[in-house]
């Protein structure tokens, strides 16, 4: 989601940012069969008028009555943390897991106001077609997952923050340099094996996961959220953080 134009180890790395505000143009100069040079530029789209035919199609999508019809309602406004809490609870409930975790980067809206919640809002919140994954984990396994993510030396944008929002409270204990040392679970019993629900993104992409009986289920997150809206509205969203960081 950032604008990047850099050379790493002889490879041109470019990103055009988010919301389609730019397009990228790469120019490759050849001399015979050899590459003589490569350059890249970002072209802002703000100065370009939209194509009228395509704009009409986009407007029709946004005006779709089924997408804009309220599927249920929120009894209170939800902030980003509240939405993450809702999603963590939904993945847990969807597979009857004891604990749910949801990656904060997968929460694509910052807030949803109180009142009617449309299908479009839910698809905006979770646009990826994410499936629920199931694992058996002990608190030690969960601790390892959280500490490794907090100290991630590769994906530094997601490191040194609370990345995994959970239905169970926990405290990340760090040293003075903000390296995670431990995770305290006040409501879990050490050594017990719990059924844990996460997104398939976490299941497939997080390093240092330790678990048994892991699998990706057929339950999709968007469907679970829509089902809960339809069946249990008005929903009271808990915006209270259950996770925190404490410096040792």
PLM regions: where:
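Short, structured coil segments at secondary-structure junctions
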Residues: 8-10
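Short, exposed beta-strand/loop patches in secreted or surface proteins that constitute
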Residues: 2-6, 172
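Catalytic centers of hydrolytic enzymes
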Residues: 16-248
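Active-site neighborhood of phospho(di)ester-bond hydrolases with catalytic His/Asp-centered motifs
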Residues: 1-3, 14-16
């Amino acid at each position: 989601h950032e604008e990047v134009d850099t050379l790493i180890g002889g490879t041109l790395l470019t990103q055009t940012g988010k919301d389609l505000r730019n397009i990228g143009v790469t120019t490759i100069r050849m001399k015979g069969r050899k590459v003589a040079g490569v350059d890249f530029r970002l072209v802002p789209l703000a100065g370009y008028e939209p194509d009228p035919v395509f704009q009409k199609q986009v407007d029709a999508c946004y005006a779709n009555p089924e997408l804009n019809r309220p599927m249920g309602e929120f009894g209170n406004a939800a902030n980003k943390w509240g939405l993450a809490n809702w999603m963590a609870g939904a993945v847990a409930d969807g597979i009857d897991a004891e604990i749910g975790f949801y990656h904060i980067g997968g929460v694509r809206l910052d807030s949803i106001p109180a009142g009617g919640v449309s299908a479009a809002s839910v698809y905006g919140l979770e646009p990826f077609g994410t499936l629920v994954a199931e694992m058996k984990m002990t608190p030690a396994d969960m601790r390892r997952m959280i500490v490794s993510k907090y100290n991630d030396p590769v994906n530094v944008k997601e490191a040194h923050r609370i990345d995994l929002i959970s239905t169970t409270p926990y405290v990340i204990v760090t040293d003075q340099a903000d390296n995670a040392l431990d995770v305290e679970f006040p409501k879990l019993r050490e050594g017990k094996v719990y059924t844990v629900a996460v997104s398939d993104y976490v299941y497939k992409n997080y390093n240092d996961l330790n678990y048994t009986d892991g699998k990706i289920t057929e339950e999709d997150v968007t469907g679970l959220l829509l089902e809960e809206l339809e069946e249990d509205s008005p929903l009271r969203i808990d915006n209270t953080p259950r996770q925190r960081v404490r410096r040792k």
